[in-house]
């Protein structure tokens, strides 16, 4: 009985007493041998073409990953810089809007402040300048209107003067020729009357008188 138990407890061939599970050493030896065979095939160039393509693709993928990681990091840094610039510009814009609003508020509160500052700046050069009254401010406006009307009238008169004169002399000559006969006709009529007076004896009626009597 004791001999049979001792034989059963003895380790089998191919196992190690320190191994946790029987047969593990054989499996490790097989994997090591397969790895050695693969390395030898790779070194000798006897690997099939499909495996070579897979290895090349893995290498290319690793390179692309590294490149994309670099590009991604650069883009991230650029985007962060743009965001910071955008925030700074927004802050500056808000400050400018605040300044404009304050300036408008001050100008609305004191409308004559700008005029007073301008007069104060001109005083050392031209002496003290008194502000214009309401009547004095309106005078230049009316003066400007008068000047404009005067220029318009002058332009109209100049245009009328530049127009050609109407032929009045021709009308006067026609009227005078129609009313008064020429000098030659007058002389002829006077000579005829004198001849008639000489030809008719005294006591006889003139042809003009005969005509009147017959009428």
From Swiss-Prot:
Tissue and organ expression note: Expressed in liver and testis. Expressed in the seminiferous tubules (at protein level).
Skewed-composition ranges (Polar residues): 150-163
Chief place where the protein resides: nucleus
Bias type Basic and acidic residues, positions: 7-19
InterPro entries on file: TCP10L/CENPJ
Ranges in a coiled coil: 69-110
Task of the protein: May be involved in transcriptional regulation. Has in vitro transcription inhibition activity. Acts as a tumor suppressor in hepatocellular carcinoma (HCC) cells.
Record lineage: Eukaryota, Metazoa, Chordata, Craniata, Vertebrata
GO biological process, one term: negative regulation of transcription by RNA polymerase II
Positions of the UniProt region annotated as Leucine-zipper: 75-96
Origin: domain of life: Eukaryota
One cellular-component annotation, GO: nucleus
Family per record: Belongs to the TCP10 family.
Subunit structure: Self-associates (via leucine zipper). Interacts (via leucine zipper) with ZIPK/DAPK3 (via leucine zipper). Interacts with MAD4.
Disordered: region residues: 1-25, 150-215
Name of the molecule in the record: T-complex protein 10A homolog 1
UniProt organism field: Homo sapiens
Record-level Gene Ontology MF annotations: DNA-binding transcription factor binding; identical protein binding; transcription corepressor activity
Cellular location(s): Nucleus
Protein keywords: Coiled coil, Nucleus, Repressor, Transcription, Transcription regulation, Tumor suppressor
């Amino acid at each position: 009985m004791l001999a049979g138990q001792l034989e059963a407890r003895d380790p089998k061939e191919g196992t190690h007493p320190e191994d946790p599970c029987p047969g593990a050493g054989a499996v490790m030896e097989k994997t090591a041998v397969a790895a050695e065979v693969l390395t030898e095939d790779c070194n000798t160039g006897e690997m099939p073409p499909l495996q070579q393509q897979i290895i090349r693709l893995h290498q290319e993928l690793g390179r692309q990953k590294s490149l994309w990681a670099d590009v991604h990091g650069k883009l991230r840094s650029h985007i962060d810089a743009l965001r910071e610039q955008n925030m700074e510009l927004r802050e500056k814009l808000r400050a400018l809007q605040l300044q404009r609003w304050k300036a408008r508020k001050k100008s609305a509160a004191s409308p004559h402040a700008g005029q007073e500052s301008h007069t104060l700046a001109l005083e050392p050069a031209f002496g003290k300048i008194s502000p214009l009254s309401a009547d004095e401010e309106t005078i230049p406006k009316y003066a400007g209107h008068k000047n404009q009307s005067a220029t318009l009238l002058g332009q109209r008169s100049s245009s009328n003067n530049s127009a050609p004169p109407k032929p009045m002399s021709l009308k006067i000559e026609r009227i005078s020729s129609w009313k008064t006969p020429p000098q030659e006709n007058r002389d002829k009529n006077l000579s005829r009357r004198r001849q008639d007076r000489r030809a008719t004896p005294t006591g006889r009626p003139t042809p003009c008188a005969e005509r009147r009597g017959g009428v």
